[in-house]
Amino acid sequence: TTKEVFSDCLHRYLIKDAIADENVLGFLVEYYKGKDESGIDYMNEARMKEIARFILTNFNKSTVDGEFNALFAIQSVPMLLQYYKIFKELNPKIKIGAVFTYAANSSQDDEQTGMNQGYANDKVTADELQVIMNDYNNTFGTSFTTDNFSAYYDDINLRMKKKKKDMEPLDLLLVVGMFLTGFDAKKLNTLY
């Protein structure tokens, strides 16, 4: 955790402070909340499909007809894998990517903190990540494997930032514990 790496907090500069100082743009936040959230099965397939349908139905509006892209922060790797399958089933043409690190990479440290982050602990195999990478390769004409995961990660980073004009961008990126802080993408305007 941050406390383990840096010890006690010296100062807090919150997003509300950054907005007030005009260092970042403000947010348009839309909340969708059920009547009673206790006892929700977040892995319920019907629930997940309804959420995916909502995202796809509102996607063009949210991303200004593809001018921007979206990021879906997901709670766990098994949940990400299920959402990935659902999105591919509901809309096979959406340019979707997914990024998480699998157990075989768990010895790698995060560049800035020196600690592991975003790693799958739930019996996730390299094969499951490779299936996602194969879809990505077919969509974008790349040839990434789990052996060159860092190149795949870098490619996703560039596509999300829409930095290269000749590089086709991603529409939607599914993540677990990654791409959430310190990620500056001017063309990313929607966070689920």
Annotate each language-model stretch with its function.
Residues T1-D41, M48, L180-Y192:
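Signature of the SF2 helicase/ATPase Hel1-core->accessory helical subdomain module
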Residues I40-V175:
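Conserved C-terminal RecA-like helicase domain
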